[in-house]
């Protein structure tokens, strides 16, 4: 019997996606990454078919003995590499993690301070997203465009005047660390809590190239497990013994999560172990690559944000492309050449420019995991120039991109090349390519 046409279509689309994004494109989306083959193999396990509500050893379902083991082990590993005391892996995304924290810290009508939207605040921090859904007022802290950061003195004054229930630091356009130490004591002085959204920089924190906000005064930290931390898509919440964490942990189930997608757990554990042994070298290479790419783009005539500050201290690079037609046009043009980035608001844009902002946001973390280094960042900058400035035929540039990727198809910073793993491997679990 031949396969139904519908099934053939599903398999064709899946294969096309895997071939395209795994072997033919420069993946420079700042919020994405790639798991190791080992992490992917344990991701595709029986856990994906199972349910487990509640906390380990206190479940509402039977048949969870191995779920309890893997969840407990994964939390221990995550606390170890994060240098934290508390971890909850049940949020299924960073936004769900934020929602649980925000709901505990404030009631409808209460106030929260955030960074401006156009300066990098994630949509979940705003009235357009999770805060709005919870009925919490968002007030934007003053922002220093020259230093691409929260204006500390003005923010302190606002904290003292507004007396919010909580303050959120961290963001989705995040070139430089927010002033956690500088604001923490002032936040606490008015009885508020400091929430740090480390979704984008969690892997950098673990790699010890970004200051740990829990050690700098943050009460609680939310993360994604699939950006600079190269694990499965999901979220987590950490604290260093905060009472807030206990309250939040009680609300995740049943308010925000029922079953928490158990197949994430072994893949997250594998990634945590990879980061334990390879995280520092990976994070350091990410920073070298982002700096190299920013400098190479600037040398070729692009307006790279943050020149006076060294361009970036994270995995991200931000480029103003207004003179070439704006972020929307240029992101699409680059995609035609198999270079994948996203359009992004820049600090001096208006919130209403979100559909066609001035900028591009570029992230180097995924191509770094494929083994690219500073030399390849020079090549990538040259490809940007060919597409955007030189206006070369995008199909010709696409050929160059595909040729470049042929040398960077294997995930690095992992144990996958060790023969000891062969007894655990299963060819049936490999991606369809």
UniProtKB/Swiss-Prot annotation:
InterPro entries per record: PyrdxlP-dep_Trfase, PyrdxlP-dep_Trfase_major, PyrdxlP-dep_Trfase_small, Ser_HO-MeTrfase, Ser_HO-MeTrfase-like, Ser_HO-MeTrfase_PLP_BS, SHMT-like_dom
Subcellular location, record wording: Cytoplasm
Predominant cellular place of this UniProt entry's protein: cytoplasm
Cofactor field: pyridoxal 5'-phosphate
Binding-site positions, (6S)-5,6,7,8-tetrahydrofolate: 121-123, 243
Keywords for the protein's UniProt record, in alphabetical order: Amino-acid biosynthesis, Cytoplasm, One-carbon metabolism, Pyridoxal phosphate, Transferase
Catalytic activity: 5,10-methylenetetrahydrosulfopterin + glycine + H2O = tetrahydrosulfopterin + L-serine
One record GO biological process: tetrahydrofolate interconversion
Description of how activity is regulated: Is completely inhibited by addition of NaCNBH(3) in vitro; this reagent is a known inhibitor of PLP enzymes, that reduces the internal aldimine of PLP to the catalytically inactive and stable secondary amine. Is also inhibited by L-cysteine, which forms a thiazolidine complex with the active site PLP.
CDD domains given in the database record: SHMT
Pfam families per record: SHMT
Recorded GO MF terms: glycine hydroxymethyltransferase activity; pyridoxal phosphate binding
Subunit structure: Homodimer.
Entry function: Catalyzes the reversible interconversion of serine and glycine with the modified folate sulfopterin serving as the one-carbon carrier. Cannot use tetrahydrofolate (THF or H4PteGlu) as the pteridine substrate. Also exhibits a pteridine-independent aldolase activity toward beta-hydroxyamino acids, producing glycine and aldehydes, via a retro-aldol mechanism. Thus, is able to catalyze the cleavage of both allo-threonine and beta-phenylserine.
Name of protein: Serine hydroxymethyltransferase
Naturally occurring in which organism (per UniProt): Saccharolobus solfataricus (strain ATCC 35092 / DSM 1617 / JCM 11322 / P2) (Sulfolobus solfataricus)
């Amino acid at each position: 019997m031949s396969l139904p046409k519908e099934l053939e279509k599903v398999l064709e689309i899946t294969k096309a996606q895997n071939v395209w994004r795994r072997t033919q494109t420069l993946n420079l989306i700042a919020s994405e990454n790639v798991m190791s083959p080992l992490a992917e193999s344990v991701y595709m396990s029986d856990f994906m078919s199972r349910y487990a509500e509640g906390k380990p050893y206190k479940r509402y379902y039977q048949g969870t003995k191995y779920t309890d083991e893997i969840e407990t082990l994964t939390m221990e590993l995550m606390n170890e590499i994060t240098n934290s005391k508390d971890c909850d892996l049940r949020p299924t995304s960073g936004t769900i993690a934020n929602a649980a924290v925000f709901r505990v810290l404030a009631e409808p009508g209460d106030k929260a301070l955030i960074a401006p939207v156009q300066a990098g605040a994630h949509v979940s921090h705003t009235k357009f997203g999770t805060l709005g859904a919870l009925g919490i007022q968002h007030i934007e802290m003053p922002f220093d465009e020259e230093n691409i950061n929260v204006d500390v003195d003005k923010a302190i004054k606002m904290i003292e005047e507004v007396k919010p229930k909580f303050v959120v630091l961290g963001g989705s356009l995040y070139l430089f660390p927010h002033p956690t130490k500088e604001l923490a004591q002032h936040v606490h002085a008015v009885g508020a809590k400091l929430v740090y959204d480390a979704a984008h920089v969690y892997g950098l924190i673990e790699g010890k190239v970004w200051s740990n906000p829990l050690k700098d005064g943050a009460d609680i930290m939310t993360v994604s497990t699939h950006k600079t931390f190269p694990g499965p898509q999901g979220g987590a919440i950490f604290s260093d013994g905060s009472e807030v964490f206990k309250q939040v942990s009680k609300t995740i189930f049943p308010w925000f999560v029922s079953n928490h997608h158990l197949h994430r757990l072994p893949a997250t554990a594998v990634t945590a172990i990879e980061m334990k042994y390879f995280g520092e070298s990976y994070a350091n290479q990410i920073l070298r690559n982002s700096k190299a790419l920013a400098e190479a783009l600037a040398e070729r005539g692009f307006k790279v944000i943050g020149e006076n500050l060294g361009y970036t201290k994270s995995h991200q690079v931000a480029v103003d492309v207004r003179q070439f037609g704006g972020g929307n046009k240029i992101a699409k043009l680059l995609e035609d050449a198999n270079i994948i980035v996203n359009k992004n608001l820049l600090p001096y844009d208006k919130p209403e420019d979100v559909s066609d902002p001035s900028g591009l946001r570029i992230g180097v973390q995924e191509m770094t995991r494929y083994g690219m280094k500073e030399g390849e960042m020079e090549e990538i900058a040259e490809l940007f120039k060919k597409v955007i400035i030189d206006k070369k035929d995008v199909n010709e540039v696409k050929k160059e991109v595909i040729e470049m990727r042929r040398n960077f198809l294997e995930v690095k910073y992992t144990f996958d090349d060790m023969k000891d793993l062969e007894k655990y491997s299963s060819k049936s679990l490999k991606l369809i390519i």
